[in-house]
């Protein structure tokens, strides 16, 4: 039996990955992390979407310690989300160590249930400037976890080389575009669906959706070509 663990926030990217995983694996587990993020609604959205999609299990883990250590606009209500980069070249929504912790815990969970695949929706093409969304970071984490647990498994990143328009196309491939558009929470200001329309996350999401809806055939063809290249 092919099992997979999906790191699941209830946002556009991780929901698209979850929909795909449910088609490709026999048993899919979702794991969501409560790190004291800006909007608790994120946890509720993840629980509802996971239930509606019928995952084998959905585990919500309390990792509140991350909130104490990682100061960010996503972990502090008194820090407004900014469109500008900080002096270190990163957006103030970057949560240091978040994906290091998440992938480590997801790997441990996969070990316990006998899953050989961990799936995360990080993306280097349209990422927000986060260093822990890069392909070389994921490969390094994969290597470290395999060595540290002496177990072969793979961290898969289905969205790594897709732009946001192609991510929408991928959701549409699995007849999940409306689900992703209406039921997910990507907005930094905590508004489900199309969001506030003002924060950096909403800007990226809307630009990708508009691109896809206005150029469906071309975007879908680009997605299919990338999928073929990956399979070779």
UniProtKB/Swiss-Prot annotation:
Name of this protein: 7-cyano-7-deazaguanine synthase
Family: Belongs to the QueC family.
EC number(s) per entry: 6.3.4.20
Domain of life: Bacteria
Key words, A-Z: ATP-binding, Ligase, Metal-binding, Nucleotide-binding, Queuosine biosynthesis, Zinc
Organism ancestry: Bacteria, Pseudomonadati, Pseudomonadota, Gammaproteobacteria, Vibrionales
InterPro entries reported for this sequence: QueC, Rossmann-like_a/b/a_fold
One MF annotation (Gene Ontology) recorded for this entry: ATP binding
Annotated Gene3D superfamilies: HUPs
Pathway: Purine metabolism; 7-cyano-7-deazaguanine biosynthesis
Protein task: Catalyzes the ATP-dependent conversion of 7-carboxy-7-deazaguanine (CDG) to 7-cyano-7-deazaguanine (preQ(0)).
Catalytic activity entry: 7-carboxy-7-deazaguanine + NH4(+) + ATP = 7-cyano-7-deazaguanine + ADP + phosphate + H2O + H(+)
Residue positions binding Zn(2+): 187, 196, 199, 202
Cofactor remark from the record: Binds 1 zinc ion per subunit.
Essential cofactor(s): Zn(2+)
Organism: Vibrio campbellii (strain ATCC BAA-1116)
UniProt record, GO biological process: queuosine biosynthetic process
List of residues binding ATP: 8-18
């Amino acid at each position: 039996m092919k099992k997979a663990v999906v790191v699941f926030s209830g946002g556009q990217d991780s929901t698209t990955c979850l929909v795909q995983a449910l088609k490709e694996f026999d048993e899919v587990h979702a794991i969501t992390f409560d790190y004291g993020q800006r909007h608790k609604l994120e946890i509720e959205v993840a629980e509802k979407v996971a239930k509606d999609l019928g995952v084998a299990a959905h585990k919500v883990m309390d990792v509140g310690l991350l909130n104490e250590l990682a100061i960010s606009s996503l972990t502090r209500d008194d820090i407004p989300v900014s469109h500008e980069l900080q002096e270190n070249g990163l957006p103030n929504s970057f949560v240091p160590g978040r994906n290091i912790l998440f992938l480590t815990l997801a790997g441990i969970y996969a070990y316990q249930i006998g899953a050989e695949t961990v799936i995360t929706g990080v993306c280097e093409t349209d990422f927000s400037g986060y260093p822990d969304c890069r392909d070389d970071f994921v490969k390094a984490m994969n290597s470290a976890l395999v060595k540290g647990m002496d177990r072969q498994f793979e961290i898969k990143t289905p969205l790594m080389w897709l732009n946001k328009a192609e991510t929408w196309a991928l959701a549409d491939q699995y007849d999940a575009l409306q689900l992703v558009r209406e039921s997910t929470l990507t907005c930094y200001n905590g508004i489900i669906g199309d969001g506030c329309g003002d924060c950096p996350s909403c800007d990226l999401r809307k630009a990708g959706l508009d691109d896809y809806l206005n150029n469906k055939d071309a975007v879908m063809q680009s997605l299919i070509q990338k999928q073929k290249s990956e399979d070779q």
